[in-house]
Amino acid sequence: MPNRDRRTNRLLSLLSDEDYERLRPSLSPVVFDYKKSLYEALRPIERVYFPVDGVASLVITTADGSGAEVGTIGSEGFVGLPVCLGDRVAPSSVYVQVPGTALGMDARVFRTELERNPTLNLIMLRYAHAFFNQVAQSAACAHLHRVEQRCCRWLLMTRDRMPTGDFLLTHEFLGMMLGVRRTTVTDVMGALQKAGLIRYRRGHVTILDHQALEQRACECYEISRLEFDRLLGDTAVTPRTDKKHRLISEVG
Protein backbone atom coordinates (compact mmCIF):
# COMPACT_ATOMS: atom_id res chain seq x y z
CA MET A 1 0.00 0.00 0.00
CA PRO A 2 1.57 3.33 -1.02
CA ASN A 3 2.78 5.40 1.94
CA ARG A 4 1.34 8.50 0.27
CA ASP A 5 -2.17 7.12 0.74
CA ARG A 6 -1.53 6.47 4.41
CA ARG A 7 -0.09 9.95 5.00
CA THR A 8 -2.90 11.64 3.06
CA ASN A 9 -5.70 10.20 5.18
CA ARG A 10 -5.62 12.02 8.50
CA LEU A 11 -6.75 9.10 10.65
CA LEU A 12 -4.31 6.59 9.19
CA SER A 13 -1.49 9.10 9.56
CA LEU A 14 -2.11 9.21 13.32
CA LEU A 15 -1.38 5.50 13.71
CA SER A 16 2.07 4.30 14.72
CA ASP A 17 3.98 2.34 12.09
CA GLU A 18 3.32 -0.83 14.06
CA ASP A 19 -0.43 -0.24 14.24
CA TYR A 20 -0.64 0.69 10.57
CA GLU A 21 1.26 -2.42 9.49
CA ARG A 22 -1.40 -4.55 11.20
CA LEU A 23 -4.08 -2.87 9.08
CA ARG A 24 -2.17 -2.68 5.81
CA PRO A 25 -2.72 -6.25 4.52
CA SER A 26 -6.50 -5.74 4.80
CA LEU A 27 -6.55 -2.37 3.00
CA SER A 28 -7.06 -2.17 -0.76
CA PRO A 29 -7.25 0.79 -3.19
CA VAL A 30 -10.74 1.85 -4.24
CA VAL A 31 -11.71 4.30 -6.98
CA PHE A 32 -14.35 6.81 -5.91
CA ASP A 33 -16.27 7.41 -9.15
CA TYR A 34 -18.58 10.41 -9.37
CA LYS A 35 -22.03 9.63 -7.88
CA LYS A 36 -20.92 6.14 -6.84
CA SER A 37 -23.17 4.72 -4.13
CA LEU A 38 -21.14 3.55 -1.15
CA TYR A 39 -24.09 2.77 1.14
CA GLU A 40 -27.85 2.64 0.77
CA ALA A 41 -29.94 3.72 3.75
CA LEU A 42 -30.94 0.89 6.10
CA ARG A 43 -28.76 -1.63 4.26
CA PRO A 44 -25.85 -3.59 5.81
CA ILE A 45 -22.38 -2.05 5.71
CA GLU A 46 -20.03 -4.51 4.04
CA ARG A 47 -16.94 -2.31 3.64
CA VAL A 48 -15.48 0.78 5.29
CA TYR A 49 -13.34 3.43 3.60
CA PHE A 50 -10.50 5.82 4.39
CA PRO A 51 -10.70 8.51 1.67
CA VAL A 52 -7.37 9.61 0.19
CA ASP A 53 -8.86 12.30 -2.01
CA GLY A 54 -12.37 12.90 -3.23
CA VAL A 55 -15.39 13.61 -1.04
CA ALA A 56 -18.36 11.49 0.03
CA SER A 57 -21.70 12.84 1.23
CA LEU A 58 -24.25 11.44 3.66
CA VAL A 59 -27.65 12.13 2.12
CA ILE A 60 -31.11 11.86 3.65
CA THR A 61 -33.88 11.23 1.09
CA THR A 62 -37.52 12.00 1.89
CA ALA A 63 -40.62 10.14 0.68
CA ASP A 64 -41.06 12.49 -2.30
CA GLY A 65 -37.53 11.74 -3.53
CA SER A 66 -35.94 14.99 -2.39
CA GLY A 67 -32.47 14.69 -0.91
CA ALA A 68 -30.30 16.85 1.32
CA GLU A 69 -26.75 16.43 2.54
CA VAL A 70 -26.27 15.98 6.28
CA GLY A 71 -22.51 15.43 6.35
CA THR A 72 -19.38 15.28 4.21
CA ILE A 73 -16.32 13.06 4.50
CA GLY A 74 -12.93 13.48 2.86
CA SER A 75 -9.29 12.73 3.56
CA GLU A 76 -9.74 13.91 7.15
CA GLY A 77 -12.03 11.04 7.96
CA PHE A 78 -13.68 7.69 7.49
CA VAL A 79 -16.78 6.28 5.81
CA GLY A 80 -18.53 3.69 7.97
CA LEU A 81 -18.87 5.25 11.42
CA PRO A 82 -21.76 2.98 12.51
CA VAL A 83 -19.29 0.08 12.53
CA CYS A 84 -17.17 1.95 15.09
CA LEU A 85 -20.23 2.36 17.28
CA GLY A 86 -21.29 -1.27 17.27
CA ASP A 87 -23.76 -1.16 14.36
CA ARG A 88 -23.63 -2.64 10.86
CA VAL A 89 -26.53 -0.80 9.21
CA ALA A 90 -26.18 2.49 7.30
CA PRO A 91 -28.59 5.11 8.71
CA SER A 92 -28.37 7.18 5.51
CA SER A 93 -27.24 6.84 1.92
CA VAL A 94 -23.63 7.75 1.11
CA TYR A 95 -22.57 8.92 -2.35
CA VAL A 96 -19.34 10.15 -3.88
CA GLN A 97 -19.80 13.84 -4.62
CA VAL A 98 -16.23 14.58 -5.78
CA PRO A 99 -14.35 11.70 -7.47
CA GLY A 100 -11.07 10.42 -6.08
CA THR A 101 -9.58 7.39 -4.34
CA ALA A 102 -9.78 5.64 -0.98
CA LEU A 103 -8.47 2.67 0.96
CA GLY A 104 -11.21 0.12 1.59
CA MET A 105 -11.48 -2.65 4.16
CA ASP A 106 -13.94 -5.39 5.07
CA ALA A 107 -16.22 -4.10 7.84
CA ARG A 108 -15.95 -7.26 9.96
CA VAL A 109 -12.15 -7.22 9.80
CA PHE A 110 -12.10 -3.55 10.77
CA ARG A 111 -14.38 -4.19 13.74
CA THR A 112 -12.01 -6.92 14.93
CA GLU A 113 -9.07 -4.52 14.68
CA LEU A 114 -10.96 -1.92 16.73
CA GLU A 115 -11.54 -4.44 19.50
CA ARG A 116 -7.90 -5.47 19.69
CA ASN A 117 -6.29 -2.04 19.27
CA PRO A 118 -7.15 0.64 21.88
CA THR A 119 -5.28 3.36 19.98
CA LEU A 120 -7.23 2.79 16.77
CA ASN A 121 -10.47 2.61 18.73
CA LEU A 122 -9.85 5.91 20.49
CA ILE A 123 -8.81 7.64 17.26
CA MET A 124 -12.08 6.57 15.70
CA LEU A 125 -14.09 7.73 18.71
CA ARG A 126 -12.43 11.13 18.49
CA TYR A 127 -13.22 11.28 14.81
CA ALA A 128 -16.85 10.36 15.54
CA HIS A 129 -16.99 13.23 18.04
CA ALA A 130 -15.53 15.69 15.50
CA PHE A 131 -17.86 14.46 12.76
CA PHE A 132 -21.00 14.72 14.88
CA ASN A 133 -19.95 18.25 15.85
CA GLN A 134 -19.63 19.05 12.14
CA VAL A 135 -23.12 17.69 11.47
CA ALA A 136 -24.56 19.80 14.30
CA GLN A 137 -22.73 22.89 13.00
CA SER A 138 -24.10 22.24 9.51
CA ALA A 139 -27.65 21.97 10.83
CA ALA A 140 -27.32 25.34 12.55
CA CYS A 141 -25.68 26.78 9.45
CA ALA A 142 -28.58 25.71 7.22
CA HIS A 143 -31.04 27.61 9.44
CA LEU A 144 -29.02 30.71 10.26
CA HIS A 145 -26.85 31.64 7.29
CA ARG A 146 -27.40 32.84 3.75
CA VAL A 147 -27.00 30.47 0.80
CA GLU A 148 -23.91 32.31 -0.46
CA GLN A 149 -22.19 31.96 2.93
CA ARG A 150 -23.02 28.26 3.05
CA CYS A 151 -21.88 27.74 -0.53
CA CYS A 152 -18.52 29.39 0.22
CA ARG A 153 -18.14 27.19 3.28
CA TRP A 154 -18.88 24.07 1.27
CA LEU A 155 -16.38 25.06 -1.46
CA LEU A 156 -13.69 25.70 1.16
CA MET A 157 -14.31 22.38 2.90
CA THR A 158 -14.06 20.57 -0.42
CA ARG A 159 -10.89 22.42 -1.36
CA ASP A 160 -9.28 21.41 1.94
CA ARG A 161 -9.89 17.75 1.11
CA MET A 162 -8.46 17.81 -2.41
CA PRO A 163 -4.84 17.87 -3.68
CA THR A 164 -5.59 20.90 -5.88
CA GLY A 165 -8.11 23.72 -6.05
CA ASP A 166 -9.78 22.20 -9.12
CA PHE A 167 -12.54 19.62 -8.72
CA LEU A 168 -15.65 18.23 -10.39
CA LEU A 169 -18.95 19.76 -9.29
CA THR A 170 -22.34 20.18 -10.96
CA HIS A 171 -25.02 22.70 -10.02
CA GLU A 172 -27.47 19.84 -9.54
CA PHE A 173 -25.29 18.10 -7.00
CA LEU A 174 -24.35 21.30 -5.15
CA GLY A 175 -28.05 22.14 -4.95
CA MET A 176 -28.69 18.82 -3.22
CA MET A 177 -25.77 19.42 -0.87
CA LEU A 178 -27.13 22.83 0.13
CA GLY A 179 -30.81 21.88 -0.01
CA VAL A 180 -31.69 24.61 -2.54
CA ARG A 181 -32.93 24.78 -6.12
CA ARG A 182 -30.52 24.53 -9.02
CA THR A 183 -31.42 28.06 -10.16
CA THR A 184 -30.32 29.40 -6.77
CA VAL A 185 -26.98 27.62 -7.12
CA THR A 186 -26.55 29.09 -10.61
CA ASP A 187 -27.08 32.61 -9.26
CA VAL A 188 -24.68 32.17 -6.33
CA MET A 189 -21.92 30.52 -8.36
CA GLY A 190 -22.30 33.17 -11.05
CA ALA A 191 -21.83 35.92 -8.47
CA LEU A 192 -18.73 34.24 -7.03
CA GLN A 193 -17.26 33.83 -10.50
CA LYS A 194 -18.00 37.44 -11.42
CA ALA A 195 -16.21 38.53 -8.23
CA GLY A 196 -13.12 36.54 -9.27
CA LEU A 197 -13.28 34.05 -6.39
CA ILE A 198 -13.85 30.94 -8.51
CA ARG A 199 -13.92 29.76 -12.10
CA TYR A 200 -16.73 27.41 -13.09
CA ARG A 201 -16.69 25.62 -16.42
CA ARG A 202 -18.42 22.43 -17.63
CA GLY A 203 -18.90 20.92 -14.22
CA HIS A 204 -15.48 21.88 -12.87
CA VAL A 205 -14.75 24.43 -10.16
CA THR A 206 -11.38 26.12 -9.71
CA ILE A 207 -10.76 28.08 -6.51
CA LEU A 208 -9.03 31.33 -7.47
CA ASP A 209 -9.08 33.30 -4.21
CA HIS A 210 -9.17 31.16 -1.07
CA GLN A 211 -8.85 34.12 1.29
CA ALA A 212 -11.75 36.00 -0.29
CA LEU A 213 -13.90 32.87 -0.08
CA GLU A 214 -13.13 32.63 3.64
CA GLN A 215 -14.22 36.23 4.10
CA ARG A 216 -17.56 35.52 2.43
CA ALA A 217 -18.14 32.21 4.22
CA CYS A 218 -19.85 32.02 7.59
CA GLU A 219 -17.93 31.28 10.79
CA CYS A 220 -19.03 27.63 10.62
CA TYR A 221 -16.10 26.81 8.32
CA GLU A 222 -13.50 27.94 10.82
CA ILE A 223 -15.33 26.47 13.82
CA SER A 224 -15.44 22.99 12.26
CA ARG A 225 -11.83 23.19 11.08
CA LEU A 226 -10.53 24.15 14.51
CA GLU A 227 -12.57 21.41 16.18
CA PHE A 228 -11.03 18.78 13.92
CA ASP A 229 -7.57 20.15 14.72
CA ARG A 230 -8.31 20.06 18.44
CA LEU A 231 -9.48 16.46 18.43
CA LEU A 232 -7.25 15.04 15.70
CA GLY A 233 -4.17 17.25 15.57
CA ASP A 234 -0.64 15.88 15.29
CA THR A 235 -0.22 16.00 19.08
CA ALA A 236 -3.56 14.32 19.83
CA VAL A 237 -2.13 10.82 19.62
CA THR A 238 1.02 10.02 21.58
CA PRO A 239 2.37 6.52 22.22
CA ARG A 240 3.11 5.62 25.82
CA THR A 241 6.33 3.86 26.74
CA ASP A 242 4.60 0.88 28.35
CA LYS A 243 3.95 -2.06 26.04
CA LYS A 244 0.40 -2.72 27.16
CA HIS A 245 -1.36 0.46 26.08
CA ARG A 246 -1.00 3.37 23.66
CA LEU A 247 -3.38 6.12 24.71
CA ILE A 248 -4.49 9.43 23.29
CA SER A 249 -3.17 12.33 25.33
CA GLU A 250 -5.39 14.85 27.05
CA VAL A 251 -6.35 17.89 25.01
CA GLY A 252 -6.71 21.12 26.89
Predicted region positions:
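Alpha-helix/helix-capping structural signal
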Residues: 18, 53, 108-109, 130, ...
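Cyclic-nucleotide recognition modules
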Residues: 71-129, 133, 137
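Short aromatic/basic micro-patch
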Residues: 14, 72, 104, 168, ...
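Polybasic "coupling" helices that flank or enter modular domains
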Residues: 97-99, 114-181
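Cyclic nucleotide-binding regulatory domains
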Residues: 36-98
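Phosphate-/nucleic-acid-contacting segments
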Residues: 157-252
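Structural motif
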Residues: 55, 100-102, 204
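Cyclic nucleotide-binding regulatory module and flanking cytosolic helices
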Residues: 1-33, 78, 83-84
